[in-house]
Amino acid sequence: MEQKEPMTQYGYEKIQKEFEALKEERPKVVEEIERAKEHGDLRENAEYHAAKERLAFIDARLTELSDLLARAQVIDPSKLPHDKVGFGSTVKLLDIEEEEEIEYTIVGSTESNPEHGLISYNTPLARQLIGKEEGDEITVKLPKGEIDFEVLEVYYKPIKFEE
């Protein structure tokens, strides 16, 4: 059975827009390939090779986006409980060793933007946080080593996505 891909309405619309834009671009790239073929020797035809590469990228990305859209599970996080960490929850953490507070919101993989505090539900940190409550402690293995966190607060706030 296909695994559903949780995302907000924003994430779904973002994927849909990219899908539509690529579907629109594809025939233009096919035309570029045909025009480039008219220039003769394809072995040394940079336009031809660039257009072929672009077409391969578009086709692969269309397949990927089509799969994502088919598996999309659009979730409205404002309608979910946030007494425990879950999809759409904002969680305030304390890095116990550094005594530093950080805040993350759990979102879909296509919506993640760690620089803006949005982490995918399938990252190592998010996977360990899901189901935790205020006061719980976790140890997360990250590339820079193990880090101990305490969950200070779990709540919902409207998600602000940055383009």
From Swiss-Prot:
Protein name (Swiss-Prot/TrEMBL): Transcription elongation factor GreA
Endpoints of the signal sequence: none
HAMAP family given in the database record: GreA_GreB
Highest rank taxon of the organism: Bacteria
GO terms under biological process: DNA-templated transcription elongation; regulation of DNA-templated transcription elongation
Gene Ontology MF, one: RNA polymerase binding
Coiled coil (residue ranges): 12-73
NCBIfam families: greA (TIGR01462), PRK00226.1-2 (NF001261), PRK00226.1-4 (NF001263)
Pfam families for this protein: GreA_GreB (PF01272), GreA_GreB_N (PF03449)
Database matches in Gene3D superfamilies: Transcription elongation factor, GreA/GreB, C-terminal domain (3.10.50.30), Transcription elongation factor, GreA/GreB, N-terminal domain (1.10.287.180)
Keywords tagged on the record: Coiled coil, DNA-binding, Transcription, Transcription regulation
Organism of origin: Nitratiruptor sp. (strain SB155-2)
SUPFAM superfamilies attached to this UniProt entry: FKBP-like (SSF54534), GreA transcript cleavage protein, N-terminal domain (SSF46557)
Function noted in UniProt: Necessary for efficient RNA polymerase transcription elongation past template-encoded arresting sites. The arresting sites in DNA have the property of trapping a certain fraction of elongating RNA polymerases that pass through, resulting in locked ternary complexes. Cleavage of the nascent transcript by cleavage factors such as GreA or GreB allows the resumption of elongation from the new 3'terminus. GreA releases sequences of 2 to 3 nucleotides.
Family membership noted in the UniProt record: Belongs to the GreA/GreB family.
